[in-house]
Amino acid sequence: MDRRSFLKTLGLGAASLVGPPACDSPERYLDSDIERLAEQKRREKEQSGKGPYGAQRYSGYRGLADLPYFELDANNDLRCIVEDLPPIIDFHAHLGMSFLFAPTIDWLARTERVQHFLDCDATNPGCEFDLDVYVNANFREDDLATLNWESVAQATWGSGAAATHTIPNLIREMDAMGIERAVLLPISLGLPFNDDSSALWSAAVEASGLGERLLPGATVHPRDPNALESLRAQVARGASALKLHPAVQRFYPDTPELEPIYAECGKIGLPVFFHGGRAGIEPEYTHRYTLIRHYEGAVAAHPEVRFVLGHAGARDVADAIPFAQKHRNVWVDIHGQGVSVLRELIDRVGAHRLLFGSDWPFYHLGASLAKVLIVTEGSPEVRSAILHGNAASLLAGEGL
């Protein structure tokens, strides 16, 4: 059996742990939804480089040093050289994950380099990296195969990439980019054992002594009968936000099962961070869960809850923009969107509703930062709001 066949077999086995969706209402996912995703990909590829910022293609993450905001240091690592940036808050980051049979990661270890899931600097020259498309459009077929391989490894023998997604490595990259704090968002997979990234990450952060800079979040699984009790325990540990991932956890955001969770978050002032929209590289059977219209019920029913829509709706950003315009209790994480779309988000949603996020360790922190610096050139107040002010207010329980 070759590597690709072996990977497919393992992937099917891993998928069986969570399973495809049960039958649900046909209107939950229509043929027109499938067609719109295909059209978005086609149109984005066609329009790349034709927006207000022209072509923005670079040779790997190190290639971002061609921009006036970065340089390569003595170790050939990317470093931000903008001197007047605010203390940046990354509202969308993670640590390495290991679950089921995989050995526990040493989150306090330091390695020579970080192996991002899109490892654009693994080769010299690096892979072509386009800042004017949704970020995962930069994944080539081999990159996706590697990502799938590492995803399976996180549940079995252990992921070599995930072993580099540690606290010292994250802090090193944060320091190089001028990022002061990062919100770490775990995901409960609903597995029978070895599935408590929230507690493990919190313990690692405490052991590192870096709790002022790294802010662990909470997570619950919608079908966990003890979800509310679990949430309260995580909040007692100091959780900064609740992460829910409809695609990975296979639920609709408007499911009645989550009503007590939303109500609790409103009561205690805890932001709810949703993965939002279809990224386009996840299993197709999960696409139905993340359509923007499925977030409407929860957001409308809980105006007291501060919701964050991750990835600005990903490839469904065209639906996410009017959704955010309609609901004043929705903030938008800008991670993943290209520079032309980021400009549109500022103009139509408003800079005061946008949050800087990196989705580290999928990508280098500089990938998201570069886009903000390009689009906010000459607009210091907009830059400060996106990189710091909005997140600081949200973490302080303000905004509504």
Residue ranges and their predicted role:
Residues A65, E180-F274, R278:
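Active-site gating/metal-coordination segments in enzymes
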Residues A239-P246, R250-L355:
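Catalytic pocket-lining loop regions of alpha/beta-barrel enzymes
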Residues H92-S98, H275, H311:
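Histidine-centered divalent metal-coordination motifs
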Residues H92, M174, C265, V332, ...:
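Conserved, mostly hydrophobic/aromatic
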Residues H165-L170, S198-A203, A227-L228, L291-Y295, ...:
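Alpha-helical scaffolding within the catalytic cores
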Residues M1-L7:
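Twin-arginine (Tat) signal peptide motif
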Residues L7-L17, Y29-V82, P86, P103, ...:
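Mid-to-C-terminal alpha-helical segments outside catalytic/metal-binding sites
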